[in-house]
Amino acid sequence: MAEQNNQISLADLPLREELRGKSAYGAPQLSVANQLNTNENPYPPSPEIVEGIARRVAELGKQLNRYPDRDAVGLREALAAYVSQQTGVGVTKEQVWAANGSNEVLQQLLQAFGGPGRSAMGFVPSYSMHPILAAGTQTEFVTVERRAENRFDIDVDEALAAIDERQPNVIFITTPNNPTGNSTPLADIERILQAAPGIVIVDEAYAEFSDEPSAVGLLEQYPTKLVVSRTMSKAFDFAGGRLGYFVAHPAFIEAVMLVRLPYHLATLSQAAAEVALEHSAATLQTVAKLRQERDRVVARLRELGYDVIDSHSNFVFFGGFAHVGDSAAVWQRFLDQEVLIRDVGVAGWLRATIGLPEENDAFLAAAAKMMDD
């Protein structure tokens, strides 16, 4: 007898066993006045970028019957020039690889350097896609805790002991860290690099919001170990463009070429990103505005009595509301006031993206009301 389609659930499918019971990644998508939960840049692309993209799309429209540049050479050249200018470290296109968001970059790296019988290490709480990508590539994911009493910094001595014990093939260091916002000093990254038996991926998705020097400066010293992952989703007002990249020794680009899908980066994606990079100086002016707003929000939250981790990113991680309720209850109270923030699963802490000044005012008003109730 044929199965009834409406009675089939995920449990009925021959899913890989290690994926059973898992939840798909994703922040709540709700229609509220102030959406401060996904760490997007709230400023739209400039008219110059919008017009430039429109012109390039019109030019390329007649060529869409052809596959894109398989290796995205022009885009990689533009990214190399940007990274060189932004970090002060000379980078060539042969050292840069681009893909559909940094998630695809990280997935390709795990496909090449992780996999069955191999492990990846992360310092948690951190970017929640790292363990999901590890699971998808059948890479064991092991963790070392970042503790609140240590302001969520990496305890390097504990990290080195864990590396010595577990011998991970891949180590993730997110700096500035998501969701906590703090940075890991280069000296600490270097100690981990020296101890690492495999590769170290430094995830710098929020680097433009920080004054800390980039790990790109360590590439020459650790050519067989270090990969620096970045994105255009945050500082570049380009989350919808889905463009991520990494910087490393050219041998790493050869490695991911073994696992990448053919023609993985669309012609229009490459063109739009190139236009955005042409206007990087103007675009990054929004970063200065967001950093100023971030510092204002942090100062006000502390005035109100909240505990706030020093942020080098475009969001704040705050606690100190136990007398009001747990994380879920406080998250709901913000939502009731038309402010959507993020409960990342760290008990007693919540994360809020820095938005436009009026959005931040709404967030701070809700935060003040909570302390007054």
Curated annotation (Swiss-Prot):
EC number annotated for this UniProt entry: 2.6.1.9
- The enzyme class is transferase
Cofactors named for this entry: pyridoxal 5'-phosphate
Under the heading CDD domains, the entry gives: AAT_like
Q: Where is the signal peptide?
A: none
Catalytic activities: L-histidinol phosphate + 2-oxoglutarate = 3-(imidazol-4-yl)-2-oxopropyl phosphate + L-glutamate
Q: Which Gene Ontology terms cover its molecular function?
A: histidinol-phosphate transaminase activity; pyridoxal phosphate binding
| Positions carrying N6-(pyridoxal phosphate)lysine | 234
Q: Which UniProt keywords apply?
A: Amino-acid biosynthesis, Aminotransferase, Histidine biosynthesis, Pyridoxal phosphate, Transferase
Superkingdom as given in the UniProt entry: Bacteria
A single Gene Ontology biological process assigned to it is: L-histidine biosynthetic process
**Subunit comment for this entry?**
Homodimer.
The record's section on PANTHER family has: HISTIDINOL-PHOSPHATE AMINOTRANSFERASE, HISTIDINOL-PHOSPHATE AMINOTRANSFERASE-RELATED
Similarity comment text for this entry: Belongs to the class-II pyridoxal-phosphate-dependent aminotransferase family. Histidinol-phosphate aminotransferase subfamily.
Record's protein name: Histidinol-phosphate aminotransferase
User: What is the source species?
Assistant: Corynebacterium jeikeium (strain K411)
Task: Name the gene for this chain.
Answer: hisC
